[in-house]
């Protein structure tokens, strides 16, 4: 999949089949958020296999205090921009808050994101999403289900807190994972869960798992681009590492991230959570 040059540029398109094979081969999957054409192009050069057009743009681009104000129109705009800068990476696009509260509504909005250039849509939630995921899957729309800490539910959680710490909570996450895979989810993304739970869940499901603050056992890793470049508003989550250090430029920072995820040196123990 990679060329022989030091930049590890992707030489052919990454597909869902590619990601499933990477899980089977135990090759780590790399993912970063991007919101425009320019950074997307650099990520392709650096060899990042998957790009997430995240609703995190509400915070890092728009300056909001959460992801809730982001609209489906915002997501379509940025997905189209990312598509224009992309060559071979696999593009995931977030469905914004309340854009998938009903299955038919979700289908309409997911179609907009796919038409804008997404290869897959991502939804936050548990087993209640099963009917929605089943409908999207039946209509040919690949789905990534986001479990654990789901930022669109931040007010219900009472803040950005680690999820799945108790045995009951861990058991619930496992059951929800199995329910959503049975409904047709093609990828599961876990956020802010204990490292060992990340391993349990990854071993239990047949689809690729991507983690952010979920330890090193998940099949892949994702970070918000601004966080891993040290561009933030004063708060750096525990699971983040600044790769724009040691005199690196942006391309080198992305390359270092890819290398450390592949080598399984990132995330380290200091980036994970305990039960």
From Swiss-Prot:
Mg(2+) binds at residues 55, 94, 124. Binds 1 Mg(2+) ion per subunit. It is an enzyme of class 2 (transferase). Its main location: cytoplasm. The active site is at residue 191. It comes from the Bacteria. Pathway: Cofactor biosynthesis; (R)-pantothenate biosynthesis; (R)-pantoate from 3-methyl-2-oxobutanoate: step 1/2. InterPro entries: Pantoate_hydroxy_MeTrfase, Pyrv/PenolPyrv_kinase-like_dom, Pyrv_kinase-like_dom_sf. Homodecamer; pentamer of dimers. HAMAP family: PanB (MF_00156). Belongs to the PanB family. This is 3-methyl-2-oxobutanoate hydroxymethyltransferase. It comes from Marinomonas sp. (strain MWYL1). The lineage of its organism: Bacteria, Pseudomonadati, Pseudomonadota, Gammaproteobacteria, Oceanospirillales.
């Amino acid at each position: 999949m990679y060329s022989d040059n030091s930049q590890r540029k992707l030489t052919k398109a990454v597909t869902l089949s590619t990601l499933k094979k990477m899980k089977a081969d135990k090759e780590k999957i790399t993912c970063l958020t991007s919101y425009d054409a320019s950074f997307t192009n650099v990520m392709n050069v650096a060899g990042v296999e998957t790009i997430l057009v995240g609703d995190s743009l509400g915070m890092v681009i728009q300056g909001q205090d959460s992801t809730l104000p982001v609209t489906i129109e915002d997501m379509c705009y940025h997905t189209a921009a990312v598509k224009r800068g992309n060559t071979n990476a696999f593009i995931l696009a977030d469905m914004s808050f309340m854009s998938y509260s009903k299955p038919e509504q979700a289908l309409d909005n997911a179609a907009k994101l796919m038409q804008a250039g997404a290869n897959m849509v991502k939804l936050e939630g548990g087993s209640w999403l099963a009917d929605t995921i089943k409908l999207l899957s039946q209509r040919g729309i690949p789905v990534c289900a986001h479990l654990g800490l789901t930022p669109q539910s931040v007010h219900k959680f009472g803040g950005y807190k680690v999820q799945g710490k108790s045995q009951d909570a861990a058991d619930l996450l496992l059951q929800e994972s199995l329910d959503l895979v049975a409904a047709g989810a093609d990828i599961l993304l876990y956020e802010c869960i204990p490292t060992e739970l990340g391993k349990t869940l990854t071993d239990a499901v047949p689809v690729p798992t991507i983690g952010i603050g979920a330890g090193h056992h998940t099949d892949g890793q994702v970070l918000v681009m601004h966080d891993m470049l040290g561009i933030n508003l004063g708060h750096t989550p525990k699971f983040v590492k600044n790769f724009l250090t040691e005199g690196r430029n942006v391309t080198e920072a992305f390359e270092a991230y890819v290398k450390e995820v592949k080598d399984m040196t990132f995330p380290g123990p200091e980036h994970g959570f305990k039960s």
